[in-house]
Amino acid sequence: LSEPCFALLVIFLLGVIFNADSTFFKWTTHRDMLRQSSVYGILACGMTLVIITAGIDLSVGSILGFTAVMFAILSIYQEWSPWLSIPACCLMGTLLGIISGVFIARFRIQPFIATLAMMVFARGMAKLVSSGMKVSPWFQQSDGTSIYREPSIFGFLDSNILQGNLAMVTLIFAICLLVSWIILSRLRIGRYIYAVGGNEEAARFSGVPVVLTKIFAYGMCGLFSAIAGICQAAQEHQGDPEAGTFYELSAIAIVVIGGTSLMGGRGGILLTLIGTLTIGYLEKILSINAVGESSRLLLTGVIIITAVLLQKRRK
């Protein structure tokens, strides 16, 4: 049994032990946990691709916030069809990711610096286009009354399917996992991603298009961030320019706890799924037992440090 799987099993058993009222045995508990973790999991899918290339992306939370605001503006104010607003927001996120990738791969800027700059830029754009205000479906009428006019796509993306047993956002997360798995396991670009992360110079001498591979990884990370932003806006029923703040830390934590190496070249999307479930169940168990947020953050930090130390020992 691998260390990430063992950690997930331990946390699951703790949930069983410390919930005498049987709350943990109800499917709604697991459904809600998956719903709450799915946005972080979608971000972690993109982060996995980047980290396997031995990179990092600090901008995912800000891109999420920007695309959440843009999706709300296009859907609520501009009344765009979802068939236009969703692809437009996905394109915006992808372009921001590609820009980061170009600076990193072509201009040899450190990933930390390049994505830190993009993090600030995207957050600034989110506040600029929204004037620093939440984009809400509430409209003020001339007579002073307010009406609530929410786009149907918000309700659809925030709904439950399969007779209420599965959240739509969880299905979207599953699709993102599948796409990421296909990229890493079934496509040539996936082999390139592992090669670049394992030894960039050796990969370059072997004919691997290192620059394009890195740009692809960061572009996909931007795309997944946009998808997460769309889901976040639908869940909150508004576009918040502050949405996604510090989400990049959660995404990195999921990838690291799952077992993907921060040094690059090793890891996989199934490990990211394990990391998502581990963090999700940990948060849910602590929430059920009324553990404060400060204690939850401390415990999560300890788990991350432990995961990194285990990686170093295994290496």
Predicted regions and their residues:
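Transmembrane alpha-helical segments in multi-pass inner-membrane proteins
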Residues: 218-219, 224-225, 235-301
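Cytosolic-side transmembrane-helix boundaries in multi-pass membrane proteins
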Residues: 1-13, 198, 205-212, 282-315
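Helix-loop-helix "hairpin" substructures at the membrane interface of multi-pass membrane proteins
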Residues: 81, 85-86, 95-100, 104, ...
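Structural signal for alpha-helical transmembrane segments and their membrane-water exit/capping regions
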Residues: 9-25, 53, 129, 180-188
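Transmembrane helix-bundle core of multi-pass membrane transporters
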Residues: 112-187, 215-216, 236-241, 291
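Single transmembrane alpha-helix segments in multi-pass membrane proteins
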Residues: 12-16, 26-78, 103-109, 253-255, ...
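Alpha-helical transmembrane segments within multi-pass membrane transporters and channels
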Residues: 79-119, 274-275
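Helix-loop-helix hairpins and the membrane-proximal interhelical loops
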Residues: 1-38, 230, 234-239
